């Protein structure tokens, strides 16, 4: 007789944490708010109940060989992250979940029609963020429809992985194993980095920091395995991201200047000029990506862009050079780097932004 997934002691520990969170959210007001947190918690618990220990999956003769190989590599990467990168691995990535879709959650971003300031949702513990994650695409689309009805630009994007910041033992899943070996390992380092430092309401800081750990971690990982030349592929992806960011900065500069005229220009004029800027950006991206060997940050051209795409993209990529310079300033000593990042994170937002801008100006590749 076929039985369902067993509840392991690790799952029981996490289940007790979920019950605690359920008790906490009952103090929140509004049916929509409670419904949102309920889907988030039950969605994560759904992953946990389907998770199996990685060694068991590796030892199962019915597991495809490529999955076994990726999971064995993931165990090595966990050890490397703990011993060489000083990351707080704990019990993360010790279980595996096979998903029926390429993403684990989807994020919704909503931005007013004539603004680049996204709507912000506020959450317990992590503060306010410019996106809202859903385990159900249907739920995300329902919320998207509400914003569209109020004239917002919106974007829904699939997310390969997310971090619970150490609250739970995050599992591996098929979103990881679908990636190439290097990208899977890099993503593991990235998600573990969020456990080190996380500044509430500063997505740019958090994501730039995690990407810097991801990049240097991957460089050291490949070097240890005698595959240092493969780091060039990661740098090429970073270069594509930076080239796209340059285009986005130019477009957002034009849009910001346009939106400042919202009180003096007719809406039809604003829409026409906005669309001209976005169309130019899409065309510039198409031309830029023609020689790339894989899709860029916005995916394969042609692309349709709006305020929400731009607001999300520029949040994630701004200060990677600054954090990489800070790491180099500390001799690639990760514990010292983490302490410096924690100190930086305690500064007022404008001061830490200025510090990262100064660091970014000093950065040169291959230090």
Question: Language-model segments: which ranges?
Answer:
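Bacterial N-terminal signal peptides that target proteins for export
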Residues: 9-19
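C-terminal motif of bacterial Sec signal peptides marking the signal peptidase cleavage site
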Residues: 29-30
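Metalloprotease/metallohydrolase-associated module, dominated by Zn2+-dependent proteases
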Residues: 33-40, 47-55, 175, 182, ...
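Amphipathic alpha-helical packing elements
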Residues: 44-81
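Acidic/histidine-rich, surface-exposed loop or edge segments in extracytoplasmic proteins
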Residues: 48-63, 121-129, 303-305, 321
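Acidic/His-rich structured neighborhood in mature extracellular/periplasmic domains
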Residues: 77-241, 253
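Pan-zinc metallopeptidase signature
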Residues: 249-367
């Amino acid at each position: 007789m076929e039985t369902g997934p067993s509840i392991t002691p690790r799952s029981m520990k996490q289940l007790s944490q979920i019950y605690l969170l359920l008790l906490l959210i009952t103090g929140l007001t509004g049916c929509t708010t409670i419904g949102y947190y309920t889907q988030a918690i039950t969605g994560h618990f759904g992953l946990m109940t389907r998770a199996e220990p990685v060694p068991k999956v590796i030892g199962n003769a019915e597991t495809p060989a490529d999955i076994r190989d990726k999971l064995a590599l993931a165990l090595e990467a966990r050890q490397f992250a703990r011993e060489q990168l000083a990351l707080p691995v704990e019990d993360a990535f010790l279980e595996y979940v096979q998903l029926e879709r390429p993403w684990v959650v989807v994020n919704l971003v909503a931005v007013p029609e004539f603004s680049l300031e996204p709507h912000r949702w506020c959450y317990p513990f992590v503060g306010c963020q410019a996106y809202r994650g859903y385990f159900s695409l249907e739920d995300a689309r329902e919320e998207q429809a509400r914003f569209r009805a109020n004239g917002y630009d919106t974007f829904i994007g699939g997310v390969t992985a997310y971090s619970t910041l150490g609250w739970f033992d995050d599992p591996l899943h098929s979103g990881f194993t679908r990636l190439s070996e290097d990208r899977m390992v890099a993503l593991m380092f990235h998600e573990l980095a969020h456990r080190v430092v996380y500044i509430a309401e500063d997505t740019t800081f958090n994501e730039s920091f995690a990407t810097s750990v991801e990049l240097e971690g991957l460089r050291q990982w490949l070097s240890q395995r005698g595959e240092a030349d493969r780091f060039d592929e990661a740098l090429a992806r970073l270069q594509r991201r930076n080239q796209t960011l340059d285009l986005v900065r130019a477009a957002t500069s034009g849009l910001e200047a346009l939106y400042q005229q919202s009180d003096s220009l007719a809406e039809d004029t604003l829409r026409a000029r906005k669309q001209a800027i976005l169309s130019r950006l899409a065309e510039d991206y198409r031309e830029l990506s023609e020689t790339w060997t894989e899709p860029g940050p916005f995916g394969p051209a042609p692309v349709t862009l709006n305020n929400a795409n731009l607001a999300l993209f520029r949040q994630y990529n701004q200060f990677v050079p600054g954090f990489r310079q800070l790491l180099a300033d500390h001799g690639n000593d990760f514990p010292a780097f983490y302490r410096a990042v924690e100190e930086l994170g305690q500064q007022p937002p404008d001061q830490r932004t200025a510090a990262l801008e100064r660091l970014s100006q000093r950065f040169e590749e291959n230090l």
